[in-house]
Amino acid sequence: MKQCEVLLIGGRAGVGKTTVGWEISAQLRTAKVAHVVLEGDFLGHVHPAPEGDPHRSAIVERNLASIWGNYEELGYRRLIYTHTVSVLPEAAAMFKRIMGTEPRLVRVLLTASDITAHERLAGRELGSELVKESERSAYKARLLDEHAPADTVRVMTDGRSVVQIASEVLATSGWTLPDARQKSVAQTRVVPSP
């Protein structure tokens, strides 16, 4: 079985993880590279938290295992996974358990200043959560800065276009190199349509 590869895109709220993930997907479709995109926040968005799972990590893992199993059965081996803390060391174990092999993990931490993150959140959080989300975002930025492993690539997002950021992040994966594209198409039974 071909080794699975995961492009982990982490970062504080408002840094652009989801938007960058979708742009990377667009660039990979153009390059005809088979892949899957999953937003980790959606895998654990339940209330209240399941009993015995206050951080919702167990339900995220169960959902990811279920979803990834379907994609893997179809031949997919590359996953773009966006989630705030996905770059932290403890996330690696989840992917190893789910993928059943030693997946190649590429960690990218998107960063933004407090001002930039708050401005982006203000455009997104139109309800009652703006103040809380902004405070949590600042806290997570410091946590990620302190605890991201040494092999994590840090990409600043302030003042840059989504296309520029996504291109830089995608380059870290090596997925668009000529050999990678050929292997992707040849070894995947189902290639997503554009």
Residue ranges and their predicted role:
Residues 126-168, 175-194:
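Small-molecule kinase domains that catalyze NTP-dependent phosphoryl transfer to phosphate-bearing small molecules
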Residues 13:
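The conserved Walker
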Residues 59-102:
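Glycine-rich phosphate-binding loop used to anchor ATP phosphates in small-molecule kinases
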Residues 17:
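Conserved lysine of the Walker
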Residues 101-122:
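Conserved phosphate-donor/acceptor-positioning beta-strand/loop module used by diverse small-molecule
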Residues 22-66:
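Conserved substrate/cofactor phosphate-moiety recognition/catalytic segment
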Residues 1-4:
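Phosphate-binding P-loop
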